[in-house]
């Protein structure tokens, strides 16, 4: 049944110290080599519930990946897209729970620094699995028919005007019975609720060792780079592109994960 995941991150994980010194306020966050070097630590300490979201992906895949596609060799497989894959954590989580012949995974990210490291990690840990890492803008690629699409903390980095088109493309590519897993940071429509959630999120980061300077520095760097939607906006957009059924299956403070059914 499963292959135990032997390694899901670089052998030497650098501590996230990117914002320990004051930065130029005009500097913007980017997924460059510096971020790649400490990315696992950054995610662990700044994205509540990320591990739980990853752990559920194989469970969802077991239910909805029904080998509806065909590999180059003619074998029945389930094709899965990991869009905005970063270091390939979602792809590795899936590979660790499926036989190599069961899945064809396409992991895509716009950052060459990310895809270079992801390729190394995936090749080192799952050399027998059919996993292709692609450096590309997800707005520009054509999706092949697939059983599952993972969009973890990715849509929020796209211009708002481009988000519908990406979701439309995903909806068309999904086979009947397939799913989209959409995980995003959100904001609440009510300003008081949102302020409470944001402050509790900063408390979460403080509890994980981030200083006030680091919290402020990253907030400034992400301004106009990471643009959140409300939960209602996400659900409305999914309905608009054709998904008739979608639900919020996970929420931790202002981070949510939605599953949408084709």
Curated annotation (Swiss-Prot):
GO biological process, one term: tRNA wobble uridine modification
Binding site for S-adenosyl-L-methionine: 50, 84-86, 137-138, 152, 219
GO molecular function: carboxyl- or carbamoyltransferase activity; S-adenosyl-L-methionine binding
Keywords: S-adenosyl-L-methionine, Transferase
InterPro entries: CmoA (IPR005271), Methyltransf_25 (IPR041698), SAM-dependent_MTases_sf (IPR029063)
CDD domains, per the entry: AdoMet_MTases (cd02440)
Keyword Repressor assigned: no
Transmembrane segments: none
UniProt-listed Enzyme Commission number(s): 2.1.3.-
Catalytic activity: prephenate + S-adenosyl-L-methionine = carboxy-S-adenosyl-L-methionine + 3-phenylpyruvate + H2O
Described purpose of this protein according to its UniProt entry: Catalyzes the conversion of S-adenosyl-L-methionine (SAM) to carboxy-S-adenosyl-L-methionine (Cx-SAM).
Subunit structure: Homodimer.
Similarity remark: Belongs to the class I-like SAM-binding methyltransferase superfamily. Cx-SAM synthase family.
Protein name: Carboxy-S-adenosyl-L-methionine synthase
């Amino acid at each position: 049944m499963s292959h135990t995941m032997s390694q899901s991150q670089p052998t030497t994980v650098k501590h996230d110290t990117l914002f320990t010194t004051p930065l130029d306020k005009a500097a913007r966050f980017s997924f460059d080599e510096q971020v790649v070097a400490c990315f696992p630590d950054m995610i662990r300490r700044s994205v509540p519930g990320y591990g739980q979201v990853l752990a559920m992906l194989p469970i969802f895949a077991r239910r909805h990946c029904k080998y509806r596609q065909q590999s180059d060799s003619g074998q029945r497989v389930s094709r899965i897209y990991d869009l905005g894959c970063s270091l390939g954590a979602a792809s590795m989580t899936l590979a660790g729970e499926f036989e190599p012949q069961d899945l064809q995974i396409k992991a895509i990210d716009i950052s060459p620094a990310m895809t270079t490291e992801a390729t190394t990690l995936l090749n080192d840990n799952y050399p027998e699995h059919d996993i292709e890492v692609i450096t590309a803008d997800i707005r520009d690629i054509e999706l092949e028919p697939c059983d599952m699409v993972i969009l973890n903390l990715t849509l929020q980095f796209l211009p708002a005007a481009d988000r519908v088109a990406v979701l439309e493309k995903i909806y068309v590519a999904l086979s009947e019975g397939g799913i989209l897993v959409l995980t995003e940071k959100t904001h609440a429509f009510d300003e008081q609720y949102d302020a409470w959630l944001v402050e509790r999120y900063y408390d979460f980061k403080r509890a994980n060792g981030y200083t006030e300077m680091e919290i402020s520095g990253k907030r400034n760097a992400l301004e106009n780079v990471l643009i959140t939607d409300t939960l209602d906006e996400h659900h409305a957009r999914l309905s608009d592109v054709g998904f008739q059924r979608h639900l919020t299956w996970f929420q931790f403070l202002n981070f949510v994960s939605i599953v949408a059914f084709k």
